[in-house]
């Protein structure tokens, strides 16, 4: 029996290796697809040298996205992003025209600055119920809170090129990354659907930091 065990174990390894290799290759391909530059520049914070990259697909009108942004993201940021361990990428996946309009406004407010963009997102998540009920008035309010005039907001929302890019990036997420709902996360290319408490997210992060 002792003689055959190593042989049997070796045979099992031989059988398992192709699937393990295939899985690793597939995971690498997904990670590359997630990291691919899109039509709109990524909203990213944290060190580019971080071991872990978390990409979130979010909608401004998604209650679970707002809950994550308000309850989980601050802890993620203080413990992992600001310490250089995690790079966080925020991507829009608007579930409706109201979310799309809010995303476009955040882009205008940010104007290439990820921190300003995320500050606008934070404001809109806090006002999510109002955004859903009184979209135009809420967008005007948020714009003014972030230094824009009424004319600036109106001009921003008429930028068809931005809407087209937003749509193209969402189609890529659906077709290539199989994103179908929000929030959807990719942790170094591993897809995780749905919001989660900080403790669960941390348990997913820790093994990636050790690799």
Predicted regions and their residues:
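Structural motif
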Residues: 51-52, 115, 180
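Extracytoplasmic thiol/disulfide redox context detector
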Residues: 2-94, 167-175, 207-211
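C-terminal cap of thioredoxin/glutaredoxin-like
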Residues: 2-5, 22-31, 59, 141-211
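Alpha-helix boundary/capping residues
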Residues: 13-14, 72, 124-127, 146, ...
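Secondary-structure boundary/capping motif
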Residues: 64, 97-98, 165, 193
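Structural alpha/beta surface segment adjacent to cysteine/selenocysteine redox centers
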Residues: 60, 66-144
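Residue-level signal for pocket-adjacent positions within structured domains
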Residues: 38-40, 126, 187
């Amino acid at each position: 029996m002792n003689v055959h065990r190593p042989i049997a174990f070796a045979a099992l390894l031989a059988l398992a290796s192709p699937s393990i290799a295939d899985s690793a290759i597939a995971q690498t391909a997904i990670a590359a697809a997630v990291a691919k530059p899109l039509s709109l520049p990524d909203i990213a914070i944290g060190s580019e040298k971080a071991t872990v990259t978390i990409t979130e697909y979010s909608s401004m009108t998604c209650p679970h996205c707002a809950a994550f942004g308000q309850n989980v993201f601050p802890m993620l940021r203080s413990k992992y992003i600001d310490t250089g361990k995690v790079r966080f990428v925020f991507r829009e996946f608007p579930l409706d025209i109201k979310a799309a309009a809010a995303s476009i406004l955040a882009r205008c407010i940010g104007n290439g600055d990820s921190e300003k963009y995320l500050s606008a997102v934070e404001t809109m998540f806090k006002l999510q119920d109002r955004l859903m009920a009184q979209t135009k008035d809420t967008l005007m309010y948020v714009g003014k809170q972030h230094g824009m005039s009424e004319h600036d907001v109106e001009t921003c929302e008429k930028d068809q090129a931005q809407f087209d890019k937003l749509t193209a990036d969402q189609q890529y997420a659906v077709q290539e990354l199989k994103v179908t709902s929000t929030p959807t996360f990719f942790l170094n290319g591993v897809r995780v659907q749905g919001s989660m408490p900080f403790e669960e997210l941390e348990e997913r992060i820790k093994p990636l930091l050790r690799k």
